[in-house]
């Protein structure tokens, strides 16, 4: 499978999918084969920085000291202190609302143990345990990268979906994003591309188009 295979499929979904009244996301569906998903070691759980970004904003939440909070304001979407950990531990319903909105969490390294103990049961199953950041470090570069990062998580299923952009993005840029994701996933599979049955690309409301490897029309 090469970039030209991907470009053909992306061009087809953009041509055949009518314009909607909202910005559609573009995602790929990866179908694996001959992989024992009952073994956690075989599951895909990757965070992938897209070279051309996601095409849309995602929210980032930060837990930190006063210094980190000050640096994160205006860059992160949610900023919390150590005192908020205990508050959220007592009000899990309120915290779940934040978790449903934030795509990634960042936490000062010194707070990680407390967050794991108090909020891990909410964050863990959703794959949203915070990324630790050293005390005093500027969080802005990490936040910028995370806003352009996607998660590829198979859990225990042979089929999983990964966002790769939005419909309004240039087809070449979407294709480059897709190749980045495919290359990462392929590199994590025991037999590489031989463990991939098929890959489809689609917009939110559009029909899926298979990316056919080696199709040189």
Curated annotation (Swiss-Prot):
- Tell me the Pfam families matching this sequence: Ribosomal_L1
One GO MF annotation is:
rRNA binding
- Please describe what this protein does: Binds directly to 23S rRNA. Probably involved in E site tRNA release.
Sorted alphabetically, the keyword list is: Repressor, Ribonucleoprotein, Ribosomal protein, RNA-binding, rRNA-binding, Translation regulation, tRNA-binding
Similarity field: Belongs to the universal ribosomal protein uL1 family.
Q: Which GO terms describe its cellular component?
A: large ribosomal subunit
Q: Which InterPro entries match?
A: Ribosomal_uL1 (IPR002143), Ribosomal_uL1-like (IPR023674), Ribosomal_uL1/biogenesis (IPR028364), Ribosomal_uL1_3-a/b-sand (IPR016095), Ribosomal_uL1_arc (IPR023669), Ribosomal_uL1_CS (IPR023673)
Q: How does it assemble?
A: Part of the 50S ribosomal subunit.
GO BP, sorted A to Z: regulation of translation; translation
Q: Which domain of life is it from?
A: Archaea
Q: What is this protein called?
A: Large ribosomal subunit protein uL1
Question: Gene of origin?
Answer: rpl1
Organism in which the protein naturally occurs: Thermoplasma acidophilum (strain ATCC 25905 / DSM 1728 / JCM 9062 / NBRC 15155 / AMRC-C165)
């Amino acid at each position: 499978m090469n970039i030209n295979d991907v470009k053909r499929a992306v061009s087809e979904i953009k041509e055949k999918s009518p314009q909607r009244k909202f910005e559609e996301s573009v995602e790929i569906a990866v179908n694996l084969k001959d992989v024992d998903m009952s073994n956690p070691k075989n599951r895909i759980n990757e965070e992938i920085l897209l070279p051309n970004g996601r095409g849309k904003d995602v929210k980032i939440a930060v837990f930190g000291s006063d210094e980190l909070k000050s640096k994160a304001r205006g860059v992160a979407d949610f900023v919390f202190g150590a005192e908020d950990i205990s508050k959220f531990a007592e009000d899990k319903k309120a915290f779940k609302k934040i978790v449903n909105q934030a795509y990634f969490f960042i936490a000062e390294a010194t707070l990680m143990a407390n967050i794991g103990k108090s909020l891990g049961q909410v964050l863990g199953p959703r794959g949203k345990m915070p990324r630790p950041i050293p005390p005093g470090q500027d969080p802005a570069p990490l936040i910028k990268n995370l806003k352009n990062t996607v998660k590829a998580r198979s859990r225990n299923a042979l089929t999983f979906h990964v966002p790769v952009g939005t419909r309004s993005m240039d087809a070449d840029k979407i294709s480059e994003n897709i190749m980045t994701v495919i290359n990462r996933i392929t590199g994590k599979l025991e037999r590489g591309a031989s463990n991939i049955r098929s890959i489809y690309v689609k917009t939110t409301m559009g029909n899926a188009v298979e990316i056919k490897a080696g199709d040189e029309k």
